[in-house]
Amino acid sequence: MKPNILFIVIDSLRADKCYGDKKTSVTPNIDSLIKNGTYFSQNITAAPATIPSISSTLAGLYPFECVAKEGNFFVVNPNIDNYVKNLKEYNYNCYATLPVLISYLGFDKVFFNNLESYHRTSTLYNGLGEKIIERFKSHAMSEPWFYYLHLYDLMWISTPARFNPDEGPDEIRDDKYGKNQYERIFSVMDTWLGRILHNLNLKNTL
């Protein structure tokens, strides 16, 4: 039986806020994944922006090899082989949940009808997390599946005009969960990641 694959991308996550003695966020679930998995402390991104970086990750190539330009935008090159295409050839059902802002930058030609997008201000704690959990509870994805989950919670804080910490959970305003809003939001994300993992069959999920 082929294992399911959950691939989580946390946009704008800094390595020093995820691991090490400088972080002040509270992340027991991510800490457990690191302890029981593999953590690459010397990993260097191929690009400082989302599309070229993710394109490189999915294709295993440098951005100039796997990114195409459509009008004024750089997109995932649909003519280049990537791991999603390879998984489909091995009879995996490939799904994605990601911000609408980037869903049309080539991802629609990778996941096609199995792509679900959400508004950029949606976060795990304001409804998105429940939708993701319901997806697992309802067995909405046919096995074996590959699920690309792109989270934008940390990006939202970079747009202060749209970020109101008073609308979020108490942890966002509690220094116990981090010395700044960025780290406190990451603490909240960890709680939700734990809930998501709790609803998975971890014995058959990578």
Language model features by range: what are they?
Residues 1-206:
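Catalytic domains that recognize anionic headgroups
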